């Protein structure tokens, strides 16, 4: 933790100066030690200020710092049509229901190998992985005290996926729910991020942190607007949910809407 070394040395110096004989060496050691204590406090306060947006995560440095944490770094699309939000059916048996278009960010394995080894980052195998999910940023950090350094790497945008276009294509265009020719390019805006502190997982045998960037699709022309509206006619693969249904966690017909869906709603 920032400032800990200086502060500790300063405290030890102050204690030592108390037992020293002779005014001059005692005064010198006292002044040096007091300076180290002040420097340690200042360094710690600067650290708190620089990480002010993550104060709720700083507790990982002192509360169970050596315990593992599961981390999911994802992005979600907000696609709104006349006050309703486009959701897609999730077919995996472990957690079925409707959810926003989106998914986990990908990372570059070889480019991040040295960093991830130093941070104790390893794949999360609580959910079976395959060649499509092998490089998903759903990982285990063996010691949660390394969590802030991991998030600093993520914020640097280095050696990881940054564009949400891939999941849009995989979930809507490749299954031919949207015409490929109309969506060769898309426009979107970054709305913000939703990050939860480390919480007890309702599913996995380890605490977890869930992060999601929210992007809003901006249709670029009439053809895109018509195609998005036509998703309403794609059967039960797509559902246009009201904010009330999303908050309630189910459609009007009682079909489950997954809990993380609320993140796409305006705050």
Question: At which residue positions do the language-model features occur?
Answer:
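N-terminal leader/linker segments that precede catalytic domains of diphosphate-processing enzymes
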Residues: 1-267
